[in-house]
A protein has these predicted regions:
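Internal helical hairpin/lid segments
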Residues: 87-167
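Extended interaction regions within the primary functional domain
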Residues: 1, 9, 45, 158-165
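Weak global preference for isoleucine
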Residues: 1, 31, 35, 50, ...
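A conserved active-site cap/scaffold subdomain adjacent to cofactor or substrate pockets
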Residues: 25, 42-112
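Alpha-helical scaffold segments in soluble metabolic enzymes
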Residues: 8-16, 33, 37, 66, ...
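Phosphate/pyrophosphate-binding betaalpha-module
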Residues: 3-63
Length: 167
C-alpha cells in the first residue's frame, strides 16, 4: 500500500523471478491524478500546491506540468527538512505574487524533471493504470496501479480472494 514511492520496489521484486509461493497485495495510488481530480471538483479555492518530494523523486517534477497548464495553479516540489519546507513556501508565494503558474523544484538535490527513469520503466512493465478508490473521496479515474495479467499469479487478492473495501 502506498504511492509512486513504493511501487518500484514491488515492480523490481516481480521482475526478478520470485518463487511461485510469493505473493503481493498491492494498492498503489497516484498523486497527479488525485490533484487533478480535487481541482476538478471546484469546491475549494487553492492558491497552489507544495508537492511531495519523495513521490517526485520517482515521477519527476514534469509529471505535474499538465496540472499547472490546465488549472493555472502554481506548484513547488519540496523536500522534508524544515529549510526545504520554508523555501518551498517562499517559492510558492513568489509565484502567486508574480502571477506565475508553473512547477518549480525546490528539492533539486533529489528530484529531476524526468524522475527516476529506471523505476518508471519497471512500473510500466509491471502495472496498468486503473481507476482507484481513495478513502474519504471515492473513485478517482486513472489514479492507481493494478498488476498486469502476466503478474497475476503473484496477486494475493486473486490467490486468496481478498476483496478491497475503502480503507
Amino acid at each position: 500500500i502506498g504511492f509512486e514511492t513504493t511501487a518500484p520496489s514491488t515492480a523490481a521484486t516481480l521482475l526478478n523471478n520470485p518463487p511461485e509461493n510469493f505473493s503481493v497485495l498491492t494498492y498503489h495510488l497516484l498523486i497527479p491524478p488525485a490533484i487533478d481530480f480535487l481541482l476538478s471538483l471546484g469546491e475549494v479555492k487553492l492558491d497552489g500546491f507544495i508537492l511531495p518530494g519523495h513521490v517526485s523523486t520517482i515521477i519527476g517534477s514534469n509529471a505535474y506540468k499538465y496540472i499547472s497548464e490546465k488549472w493555472h495553479i502554481p506548484q513547488v516540489v519540496a523536500g522534508f527538512e524544515p529549510l526545504d519546507v520554508l523555501v518551498g513556501i517562499y517559492m510558492l508565494l513568489k509565484q502567486v505574487r508574480e502571477g506565475r503558474t508553473e512547477v518549480e523544484n525546490e528539492y533539486v538535490r533529489a528530484v529531476r524533471p524526468e524522475g527516476n527513469v529506471k523505476a518508471k520503466e519497471m512500473m510500466k512493465r509491471v502495472f496498468d493504470v486503473v481507476d482507484a478508490r481513495w478513502r474519504g473521496i471515492g473513485t478517482i479515474p486513472c489514479s492507481g496501479f493494478k498488476l498486469k495479467k502476466e503478474f497475476e499469479n503473484f496477486d494475493a487478492s486473486k490467490k486468496f480472494e481478498i476483496a478491497f473495501e475503502e480503507f
